[in-house]
């Protein structure tokens, strides 16, 4: 019914986001993966949407990428997997790692995700492997995605660490982006240390 929503990000947490569009505020349930990629509140943002309808409620799920939405919809096709568990899977692993776990028949990668035990992991792989292969152009493998995702994950982790330390997200994003533009071959710890030094000097 809905392809995506583009509007002003009013607020968000690790599992929820509110977007205002033409005077109407929409509440989205999101994964931790999407939450880590959202900009500051007050910024314009676009979320790919999935409307889930049940007898007592209509729920909007939002995704930062079309890939994540496609995988969410695929997970819903597995027996015993509802929106809550599907979102938990997407919060526990990056999209390409979930894809590879299913395609390569490695249920161990799904263990440890909240709500996913051995039987559930095995069932997801058994029921979805053939289906996910048809989505491979939309959901590329880790090999194809690794360079981009490694850099993106490094950036996201560094920004999250700085925000956790109390720095404004905007300042953290700007500083981390600048540092990685200069040198992308570094660890999260190195980026955070350099960022802390830059932010400290800027405040002097």
UniProtKB/Swiss-Prot annotation:
Keyword line: Cytoplasm, DNA damage, DNA recombination, DNA repair, DNA-binding
Q: Positions of the region Domain I?
A: 1-64
InterPro entries according to UniProt: DNA_helicase_Holl-junc_RuvA_I, Hlx-hairpin-Hlx_DNA-bd_motif, NA-bd_OB-fold, RuvA, RuvA_2-like, RuvA_C, RuvA_C_sf
Q: What's a single GO CC term here? A: Holliday junction resolvase complex
Q: Where in the cell is it found?
A: Cytoplasm
What SMART domains is this protein classified in?
A: HhH1
Lipoprotein found in the keyword field: no
Q: Where is the region Domain II? A: 65-143
Annotated region Domain III: the residues are 150-204
> Which stretches does the entry tag as region Flexible linker?
144-149
Q: Name one GO biological process term.
A: DNA recombination
Q: Which GO terms describe its molecular function?
A: ATP binding; four-way junction DNA binding; four-way junction helicase activity
Q: Give the record's subunit note.
A: Homotetramer. Forms an RuvA(8)-RuvB(12)-Holliday junction (HJ) complex. HJ DNA is sandwiched between 2 RuvA tetramers; dsDNA enters through RuvA and exits via RuvB. An RuvB hexamer assembles on each DNA strand where it exits the tetramer. Each RuvB hexamer is contacted by two RuvA subunits (via domain III) on 2 adjacent RuvB subunits; this complex drives branch migration. In the full resolvosome a probable DNA-RuvA(4)-RuvB(12)-RuvC(2) complex forms which resolves the HJ.
Q: Which family does this protein fall into?
A: Belongs to the RuvA family.
What role does this protein play?
The RuvA-RuvB-RuvC complex processes Holliday junction (HJ) DNA during genetic recombination and DNA repair, while the RuvA-RuvB complex plays an important role in the rescue of blocked DNA replication forks via replication fork reversal (RFR). RuvA specifically binds to HJ cruciform DNA, conferring on it an open structure. The RuvB hexamer acts as an ATP-dependent pump, pulling dsDNA into and through the RuvAB complex. HJ branch migration allows RuvC to scan DNA until it finds its consensus sequence, where it cleaves and resolves the cruciform DNA.
Supply the domain comment: Has three domains with a flexible linker between the domains II and III and assumes an 'L' shape. Domain III is highly mobile and contacts RuvB.
Q: Which NCBIfam families match?
A: ruvA
This chain's protein is named Holliday junction branch migration complex subunit RuvA
- Please tell me the species this chain comes from: Chlorobium chlorochromatii (strain CaD3)
Taxonomic lineage from the root: Bacteria, Pseudomonadati, Chlorobiota, Chlorobiia, Chlorobiales
